[in-house]
Amino acid sequence: MNPLITDFQTPQQRTPVIVALDFANEKDTLGFVRNLDPALCQIKIGKELFTATGRSLAESLIHQGFKLFLDLKYHDIPHTVAQACKVAADMGVWMVDMHASGGRRMMEAAAEAVAGYGTKPLLIGVTVLTSMEQSDLAEIGLNTAPEEQVIRLAKLAQSSGLDGVVCSAQEAAPLRRELGRDFVLVTPGIRLDVAGNNDDQRRIMTPAEALAAGSTYLVMGRPVTRAADPVAVLREVNRVANLEAN
């Protein structure tokens, strides 16, 4: 049975998908989300869309009832990251991330900055980008396997007060064993069918595989946003998630 984060979702209503809104502008984004139900998914805004639209779009989506993952991958001095997390909390952001390689002091400052909020955003550490393989790590001076580096950074994130990490589905099972059932695992690189995949997410799995491995949330972009019926895709993944939970 897949571990559940019971503080955030009940087994009967598990909705693990975070839809990556990888659109270039506000018009296309709002046109797409108009047909989504906040009860079926969470949504994510990344660097491109946030840079193009600023906080106004993010706040609009939050006001529509969506749980928003602000995926800006903070990596800066502790004070700067802490202040950014406070701004995100003031906006009502549900989840925000930062590079765990920014170190303990940066992550502890972020956790302390939002500790006083009644409803604080989940703080998530970015470990190893899913586009990176062992050869990529070697090029930046890390002579270790991706899984080893992920576990090292995830342990650091947990001990620094973060709520979870971003990891590929391949790392989910060992992380779940190492860090326990309450640590949030956010998994990108999710595809409905891995056969013939040639995009930039190297370490990929299907929703069922990722959930079985221990992932808490599944980041899905094109498989949802380019689907003929995005709602049908979300309902099917939710169905699989609740079967896995039971």
From Swiss-Prot:
Substrate binds at residues 22, 44, 71-80, 130, 191, 201, 221-222. One of its GO terms (cellular component) is cytosol. InterPro entries: Aldolase_TIM (IPR013785), OMPdecase (IPR014732), OMPdecase_AS (IPR018089), OMPdecase_bac (IPR047596), OMPdeCOase_dom (IPR001754), RibuloseP-bd_barrel (IPR011060). The active site is at K73 (proton donor). Pathway: Pyrimidine metabolism; UMP biosynthesis via de novo pathway; UMP from orotate: step 2/2. It is an enzyme of class 4 (lyase). Its EC number is 4.1.1.23. GO terms for biological process: 'de novo' pyrimidine nucleobase biosynthetic process; 'de novo' UMP biosynthetic process. PROSITE patterns: OMPDECASE. Keywords: Decarboxylase, Lyase, Pyrimidine biosynthesis. GO terms for molecular function: orotidine-5'-phosphate decarboxylase activity. It comes from the Bacteria. It catalyses: orotidine 5'-phosphate + H(+) = UMP + CO2. Homodimer. Belongs to the OMP decarboxylase family. Type 1 subfamily. HAMAP family: OMPdecase_type1_B. Catalyzes the decarboxylation of orotidine 5'-monophosphate (OMP) to uridine 5'-monophosphate (UMP). This is Orotidine 5'-phosphate decarboxylase. The lineage of its organism: Bacteria, Pseudomonadati, Pseudomonadota, Betaproteobacteria, Neisseriales.
